[in-house]
């Protein structure tokens, strides 16, 4: 599995405004309270569920799992360095919310099918699974040419993943989370150099530098776009 170390490190995704907007979206779709048990698969630094914990005043810390352990993890969460399939092989907890935000595409298709079957077995009776992926059509992320090519290939695979989810959970609910991004170009260039998205991970440094030059020429100093995510909501009674 690929490790994305900087997706939530000094990006709009780590901003208070984004996290508040994201958590507002989640809570609009699923009622949670201080007794709720929450799991975030691929939690990164855990800022999203950490903030959610404070907002709900959770009795028990939300659990975040990831294959990368960051030194600056949110202290409001309980963290385990483990992959999802290994975690569920021994887990006994029934969760009210399982969150998978922009990480399911890092698994191979067989692993995804196994994970989807395991998820419902680890939900409470009224629990929900939220799976977020990038918008697969007309995606507006600022890109350079090679990044765009790789992103389109990745989004094509995401469509396959969404079809697999629909086959296993035919009554799933589909929503969209849209966040209006406004970022200074030099900050976005740093994100590119830090390989904030999986499509950049395997690119040689030479191609990254070319891409930085291309984006620097292509975009204005203040970059504005809509960051769109597809949210698939699954429940226990399928």
Regions found by a protein language model. Give the residues of each.
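Conserved class I S-adenosyl-L-methionine
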Residues: 1-33, 47, 51, 130-156
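A short glycine-rich, Lys/Arg-flanked "PGG" loop and its adjoining helix->strand segment in the class I
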Residues: 113-125
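Short alpha-helix
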Residues: 155-169
